[in-house]
């Protein structure tokens, strides 16, 4: 199963990149890692309020200001690993940010997880937009 999202942001690619890789910026809209996301590094992200480990994986690709991808695992997925990829494109007035979350468990039994992740990405991206547009 694959989820895809796309949003437009009134921000430069470098500002959007910071929101995807910098722990303090990630904490605003997503979950906070222990260190900046960098190619080849393992990562863990924690709830900003709970402090609980929520997701983990490895940064596969980090081409600054253009493309970021990492493996993505959360507790409800068990041992399954998916991949999150971000692509940043210049557009007049800002940046188009595209998300592809692929390799999610398929089938009727896993559809509840897909629905939760779909809504979660919508909520997270709305927070990113709100924060970037307020800056």
Predicted features along the sequence, with ranges:
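Short, flexible helix/strand-to-coil boundary loops that buttress conserved ligand/catalytic motifs
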Residues: 20, 30, 72, 132
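Short, low-complexity N-terminal intrinsically disordered segments enriched in polar/charged residues
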Residues: 1-14, 115
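Short amphipathic alpha-helical/adjacent loop interface patches that line ligand
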Residues: 13, 20-23, 118, 125
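Structural motif
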Residues: 13, 41-42, 66-67, 94-96
């Amino acid at each position: 199963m694959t989820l895809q999202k796309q949003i437009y942001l009134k921000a430069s690619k470098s500002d959007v990149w910071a929101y995807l890789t910098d722990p303090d910026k990630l904490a605003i809209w997503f979950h906070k890692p222990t260190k900046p996301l960098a190619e080849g590094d393992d990562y863990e992200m924690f709830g900003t309020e709970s402090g609980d480990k929520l997701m983990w994986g490895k940064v596969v690709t980090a081409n600054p200001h253009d493309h970021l991808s990492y493996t993505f695992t959360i507790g409800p997925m068990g041992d399954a690993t998916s991949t999150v990829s971000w692509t940043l494109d210049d557009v007049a007035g800002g940046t188009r940010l595209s998300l592809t979350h692929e390799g999610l468990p398929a089938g009727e039994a896993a559809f509840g997880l897909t629905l939760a992740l779909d809504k979660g990405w919508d909520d997270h991206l709305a927070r990113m937009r709100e924060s970037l547009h307020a800056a």
